[in-house]
Regions:
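Glycine- and acidic-residue-biased ligand/ion/polar-headgroup-sensing regions
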Residues: 45, 56-67, 84-85
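Phosphate-/nucleic-acid-contacting segments
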Residues: 155-208
Length: 208
């Protein structure tokens, strides 16, 4: 049972307005969703989900920055980065109910809204508009992942950096150099050279 504080949490109310802007939601659907959304504040590098465990939640960034990553041969490979209003989750595990290939953690101090996938499925069954919202949000998530994969396969490192510089400059400034290099599929040294060429600076979060 949600508490009064949860029902009237400003961050959750703001997130519900964002959802309503994505697709119209009835007052009944918004009230039901508010009972299933939980907000927490986390410090930098707080682990939300660990690789090899079965995922149970979706995470929506209210404030801050999250990343999804995979441990491979002793290294962390950053798969996705998410700022405000982004959704991060171990979708492979949520859909298959098998252990996940990915971990999710905060990159900076963050406010995160979570919803249990089981609760979301119950909302899908009860409210058609919530099912549509979920479909739209998951489609957006997959399109972002597909764009990132396509970029890695068909663009040079410099072209990938240029895309971020044009479309998401805040992500460049807020993401530590090592995470950003991993996300772009290059070494930190290569990223430093590219940033220097394009007038960037590594004074922003130069360390992990």
């Amino acid at each position: 049972m949600a508490t009064k504080e949860q029902l009237y949490n400003p961050a959750i109310e703001s997130m519900l307005r964002f959802f309503h802007a994505v697709t119209p939601l009835s007052p009944e659907a918004m009230a039901a969703m508010s009972c299933c959304l939980y907000q927490e504040k986390y410090p930098r590098r707080h682990l939300l989900h660990q690789q090899h465990r079965v995922a149970a939640h979706l995470y929506i960034v209210s404030k801050g920055l999250l990343r999804s990553y995979h441990h491979h041969q002793g290294k962390e490979v950053t798969i996705a980065l998410g700022m405000e209003n982004s959704v991060l989750c171990a979708m492979d595990s949520l859909l298959s109910h098998q252990p996940s290939y990915y971990s999710i953690e905060t990159v900076e101090e963050s406010e995160v809204i979570s919803i249990a996938y089981n609760d979301l499925e119950l909302l899908y069954n009860e409210f058609h508009e919530v099912e549509r919202l979920g479909r739209l949000m998951i489609s957006r998530y997959y399109l972002e992942q597909e764009a990132a994969l396509r970029s890695l396969r068909f663009q040079t490192a410099e072209e990938r950096y240029q895309d971020l510089l044009m479309n998401n400059p805040a992500l460049l400034q807020r993401t530590p150099l090592g995470y950003l290099a991993s996300y772009l599929g290059i070494t930190p040294a290569t990223l430093s050279r590219i940033r220097a060429k394009w007038g960037g600076s590594d004074r922003y979060h130069s360390g992990i």
